[in-house]
Amino acid sequence: MRQETGSNPNQAPKKVSIQVKLGGRSFSAEDITVAEGTEPIEFVIDTPRVTLAPREEVSLDNAAALLSLTGKACHSNEQSVCSELQNDIVAIIAIDNKALESIVAKWGSRASFSSPLLDMRHSDELCLTIDTSESVCYMRLFDGGLQCAEANIASTAEDTLYWAKKMVGERDIPIYIKSSAAVAKLLRKYFKRVVCE
């Protein structure tokens, strides 16, 4: 039912996905209009240059260094941003400088950043969760909490299979996947319990 009057403080933030391809951005800043209001707008950055870290380890001063320590340093045309806190975890994300400038110019402090790597569905189980975009594979290994999280370049089903084998090893655990049918079909040849979501 739609609320007719008053404000709705439980309104979910608006989300905008930014896919980083070949050092560029997949949206045109001119095509994005400034939304009226004061509600936050979350930008979900699709890039393999992202890592998760405990809140107490991350500050604006060391975010880029932490990203670099994981082998995912920002390129010369990028800088790091941090996500909002989620389950005591922060995502440190590399974002294109021009994209960041456009976002800040249009939305200022209303803008926040996130990553598909922060998806903690099934976090209480022993399992692997996989989300794939056009060129990135996001994997999270859980065992009653987050054990490992990786974002890797994966443009084919075989790339995703490689990363899944590397993360799961010989364990027989469920794999929950949000991806194309081709990826799920290939994974089912190697793993017993693959569930498409």
Which role does the model predict for each range below?
Residues 1-197:
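Hydrophobic/aromatic-enriched cytosolic interaction surfaces used to assemble or bind macromolecules
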